[in-house]
C-alpha cells in the first residue's frame, strides 16, 4: 500500500515568504538608519567644535610652569584632536632640560592629558656668571634660561671627587631637607678633607662631612628646635651646629677665644651654663630621634 504524500499549502508558504521579506526590509532599513546616524555623528564630531582641543590636564610638573608646557603643546588655536600630533608635542616638551619624560594621551574629547616626569634640582650653582640648576645626575644645565626655583642649596667651591661626594649626599636627601639649606661651601682642612659648611634658611650654620651629612641632616628640624631662640627666631647664644662627628653646638665665642681650633669633631670644653644647656638639649634631641627610629 503506497503512503500518501501530504499536500503543500501554497497559501501558507506565500504568507511565510511575505513575512520574511518584510522582516528583511525592516532589518535593512534599520542597518541603513544606523549607518546614517553613525556617519552624521562622525561628521558632527569632525566639523564642529566638539573635536577641538580647548584645554590640557597637566600632571607631574613642579619646576616647569603650566604656562611653559601649554606654550609647547601649541593648542591655543584649538586644533582638532584627530589631527593633533602628540608625538611632535612630546618632542618639543622634551627640549626643556628639566623634563625627563612626558606622555600625552588623547581621547575622543578634550582635555588632553599630559603626564610629566621632571628631573630633580638638587643644587644651584654659577656658570659663566649665570645662576643655573644642577639635576640629580650631577649635570649642570648650563643653557638653562628660565628662572631657577629657590628651593635647592647654592653650592660653591666643589671640584672633582668632592663635588661627586656632595652630589651623592644631595641625592640621598629628600626635597624638604634640601629646601632647608640656603648655601653649601667647601671648607676642607688637613685632618678633615670632606668638611663642608651649610648655611640654613633659618639662619643657623651647620658644619658637616660630605660622607655623613645626608643621614645626619634628617634630624635637623629637631636640632634647630632644641636650641634656645629669642622672639625673632635668632639664637640667644650665637654659634653653629657641628655634625662632622656626632652632634655638638659650638658657640662662636669658643671659636673666637681659641677654645676650638676648627669646626671639627673635637669636643668643646665646658662653657657657661647656657652653652652647656644648649649642647645638652641638642644632643638629647638627636638621641631621642635615633631611639625612636630604632624602635620602629
Curated annotation (Swiss-Prot):
GO terms for biological process: FtsZ-dependent cytokinesis. The keyword Signal does not apply. InterPro entries: Cell_div_FtsQ/DivIB_C (IPR005548), DivIB (IPR026580), FtsQ_DivIB (IPR050487), POTRA (IPR034746), POTRA_FtsQ_type (IPR013685). Residues 51-119 form the POTRA domain. It is a single-pass type II membrane protein. The chain crosses the membrane at residues 30-50. GO terms for cellular component: cell division site; plasma membrane. Disulfide bonds: none annotated. Residues 256-296 are annotated as: Disordered. Its main location: membrane. Keywords: Cell cycle, Cell division, Cell membrane, Membrane, Transmembrane, Transmembrane helix. Coiled coil: none annotated. Residues 1-29 are cytoplasmic. Residues 274-296 have a biased composition (Basic and acidic residues). Residues 51-296 are extracellular. Residues 256-273 have a biased composition (Polar residues). It is found in: Cell membrane. Belongs to the FtsQ/DivIB family. DivIB subfamily. Cell division protein that may be involved in stabilizing or promoting the assembly of the division complex. This is Cell division protein DivIB. It comes from Staphylococcus pseudintermedius (strain HKU10-03). The gene is divIB.
Amino acid at each position: 500500500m503506497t503512503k500518501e504524500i501530504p499536500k503543500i499549502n501554497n497559501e501558507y508558504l506565500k504568507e511565510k515568504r511575505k513575512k520574511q521579506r518584510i522582516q528583511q526590509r525592516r532589518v535593512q532599513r534599520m542597518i541603513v538608519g544606523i549607518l546614517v546616524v553613525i556617519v552624521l555623528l562622525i561628521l558632527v564630531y569632525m566639523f564642529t567644535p566638539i573635536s577641538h582641543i580647548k584645554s590640557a590636564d597637566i600632571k607631574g610638573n613642579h619646576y616647569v610652569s603650566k604656562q611653559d608646557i601649554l606654550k609647547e603643546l601649541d593648542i591655543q588655536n584649538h586644533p582638532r584632536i584627530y589631527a593633533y600630533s602628540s608625538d611632535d608635542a612630546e618632542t618639543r616638551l622634551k627640549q626643556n632640560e628639566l623634563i625627563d619624560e612626558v606622555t600625552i594621551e588623547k581621547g575622543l574629547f578634550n582635555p588632553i592629558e599630559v603626564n610629566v616626569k621632571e628631573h630633580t634640582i638638587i643644587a644651584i650653582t654659577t656658570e659663566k656668571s649665570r645662576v643655573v640648576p644642577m639635576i640629580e645626575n650631577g649635570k649642570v644645565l648650563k643653557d638653562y634660561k628660565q628662572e631657577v626655583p629657590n628651593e635647592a642649596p647654592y653650592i660653591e667651591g666643589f671640584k672633582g671627587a668632592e663635588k661627586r661626594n656632595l652630589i651623592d649626599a644631595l641625592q640621598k636627601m629628600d626635597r624638604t631637607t634640601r629646601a632647608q639649606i640656603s648655601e653649601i661651601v667647601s671648607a676642607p682642612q688637613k685632618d678633615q678633607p670632606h668638611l663642608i659648611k651649610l648655611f640654613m634658611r633659618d639662619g643657623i650654620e651647620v658644619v658637616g662631612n660630605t660622607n655623613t651629612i645626608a643621614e645626619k641632616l634628617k634630624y635637623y628640624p629637631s636640632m634647630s628646635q632644641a636650641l634656645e631662640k629669642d622672639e625673632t627666631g635668632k639664637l640667644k647664644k650665637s654659634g653653629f651646629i657641628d655634625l662632622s662627628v656626632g652632634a655638638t653646638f659650638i658657640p662662636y665665642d669658643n671659636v673666637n677665644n681659641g677654645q676650638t681650633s676648627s669646626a671639627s669633631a673635637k669636643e668643646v670644653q665646658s662653657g657657661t651654663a647656657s652653652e652647656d644647656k644648649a649642647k645638652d638639649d641638642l644632643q638629647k634631641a638627636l638621641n631621642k630621634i635615633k631611639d625612636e627610629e630604632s624602635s620602629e
